[in-house]
Amino acid sequence: MIGAGINSLDDMNASVTAGVGAKRENSVPSSEGTRISIIVPVWNEASLIRPFLQHVRERAPETEIIVVDGGSSDGTAKLAETFADRIVRTRRNRAVQMNAGARAAGGDVLWFLHVDVELPAQCLDEIGRTLKDPNVAGGYFRIRLPQSPFVYRLTDSFAHYAGILLRMRCGDHGIFCRRQLFEDLGGFPETPIMEDVEFFRMLHRRGRVAYTRKRLVVSPRRYEEVGMLRLTLAYGLIATLYAGGVPLRVLRWLYARTCCSIKNR
């Protein structure tokens, strides 16, 4: 049920353990008096998790980091213990994982990040500036690929403004919002796909959703695995079908066959 995800039994049954990072003095609020909890859903990301978390510690030191593992078989959760404040273990479903992470979080602001992004400098200041406006329900970062070719920059610009028009943003954009509003909305709808877009639209119903001046740098790994043209066209098709009301189970089937490499299906 949309809006009921955060209280589901899957979240209630999630196990939570403290990471080594919990021992540091990170409980002091930022200069704005607001503590930010970063929630990272992962599955089999052993090669990325430690360098990513170390990067987050450097760019966003005054935050609580919660890694939510969806049943990894490569030791991802164990590797995360060095830098994370809490490790949450639950079943593999991004919405379930993010809701479980939100339940374990202690911050006033929840920031949902993917493990393959690079944070801009002063990212916490960007979030604080965005949420100063009481009419803003939440926010997100624009994204770019490292050393983006011109065709991708053109596609990104089109997708950005189309997303504003259609009120659609995915999890790559690092969506953030106040904890109280997240709880009022019931968290992410625990759907098989488009949970981030659904939640983004829920935020829009409660106020303006603003984007920051700085960008997240996202990994090109999926474009490299699937192919830039194929992935761009697939994303556009799925977004169009979603806007047209095609059932999510159909979109999930299409996504698995067009947006994932063979090894990840």
Model segments located where?
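Acidic donor-binding/catalytic loop of UDP-sugar-dependent glycosyltransferases
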Residues: 75, 115-129, 201
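Short, well-formed alpha-helical segments that are part of the catalytic scaffolds
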Residues: 44-59
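Conserved donor nucleotide-binding strand/loop of the catalytic core
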Residues: 63, 77-104
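A conserved acidic beta->alpha catalytic loop
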Residues: 55, 69-77, 117
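Hydrophobic helical membrane-anchoring modules
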Residues: 2-19, 23-32, 201-265
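Conserved donor NDP-sugar-binding/catalytic core segment of glycosyltransferases
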Residues: 122-151
